[in-house]
């Protein structure tokens, strides 16, 4: 059975998540209040709809509790983000991931019980800085605050002489 996800907020971050999940063979419901954004992605995902993600009635009517996860990519409207996260947790969505605008927003999301809180711009900035520090590191992922997994390109034997 295909995994099913909802992505709330179709800015560049949300849109890229929705498109990649769809490309990976998942069923994706993409939601935004801006009809232009909805129209821009409608032909590329399973379902695209215009709605206010801060409206609990909408979230319940969507059947979100039956999804594998909901990604709340909307962080400009703190109220909509928080209300969507609260409703998703209250109705039993198994995995709620939310983008935080700032540390206070993240604190509220954590208190609501959001499973994963992300700061995409901050995380990408740290990742890029670490990549810039060594031409040998081609990629890395943080496993915990103390451990990382690195993809390292070793120099060719003739460069070692």
Model-identified regions with their sequence ranges:
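Short beta-strand element of Class I
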Residues: 27-28
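Helix N-cap at the beta1-alpha1 junction of Rossmann-like dinucleotide-binding domains, i.e.
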Residues: 35-36, 103
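Glycine-rich Rossmann-fold phosphate-binding loop(s) that bind the pyrophosphate
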Residues: 10
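N-terminal Rossmann-fold NAD(P) dinucleotide-binding loop
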Residues: 14
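Single conserved hydrophobic/aromatic residue that forms the stacking wall/gate
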Residues: 152-161
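Phosphate-bearing ligand-interacting subdomains
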Residues: 44-134
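Conserved acidic E/D residue at the C-terminus of a beta-strand in Rossmann-like folds
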Residues: 32
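Short alpha-helix immediately C-terminal to the canonical SAM-binding loop
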Residues: 38-39, 106
């Amino acid at each position: 059975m295909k995994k099913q996800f909802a992505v709330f907020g179709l800015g560049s971050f949300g849109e890229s998540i929705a498109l990649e999940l769809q490309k990976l063979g998942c069923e994706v419901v993409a939601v935004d209040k801006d009809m232009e954004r909805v129209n821009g992605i409608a032909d590329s995902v399973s379902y695209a709809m215009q709605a206010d993600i801060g409206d609990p009635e909408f979230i319940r009517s969507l059947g979100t509790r039956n999804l594998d996860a909901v990604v709340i990519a909307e962080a400009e409207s703190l109220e909509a983000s928080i209300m969507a996260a609260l409703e998703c947790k209250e109705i039993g969505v198994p995995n709620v991931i939310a983008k935080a605008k700032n540390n206070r927003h993240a604190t509220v999301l954590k208190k609501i019980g959001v499973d994963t809180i992300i700061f995409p711009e901050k995380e990408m900035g740290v990742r890029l800085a670490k990549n810039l520090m060594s031409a040998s590191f081609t990629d890395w992922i943080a496993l915990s605050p103390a451990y990382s997994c690195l993809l390292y390109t070793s120099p060719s034997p003739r460069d070692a002489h």
